[in-house]
Amino acid sequence: HLPPDVPAYRLVDKLEGESLNEAKLNEAAVLALAWSRAWNGGGAHGTVYSVKPAQVSKSAQTGEFVGKGAFVVRGQRTWYKDMDVRIGIGLIAVNGVPMVVSGTPEHVQATCPRHAVLAPGRTKKEQLANTIYRTTGLSTDELLAVLPGACDVIEEYGMLTPPAQEEE
């Protein structure tokens, strides 16, 4: 179980007393964009949309064809246009155990003292994971799980370089 302020991907059947406000929907849109094909496409901006579950169907109406593995979306879509393709990764300690987390850059910056902001780029994610491993000691498997693809580091605060030591 993670503390409530730790960014994490959660799948829930219903929200317990929480409502989805515009800020949470924007965070979900940023994450959906970062984990989509837009990341490997290398673009700096992208567009995503959201729909209600009842609007998604695997069955076709008369005269329509739906290919294997495809879905049909009917009705009004909520569009999130011209969003930055970026993701934040950060280092936190949960019950004394260091963990790497990913989320929206703003949320990770607010939660994790050691963090980095990433954008699509040319550095292979395995190479970046090895660099972070040498600095933090976290396993490369954990790091690869939070990196969406080849990326460039936009901002960095202690993830690629050791944090500054205070002199006594």
Predicted regions located by residue number:
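Extended, highly charged segments
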Residues: 1-168
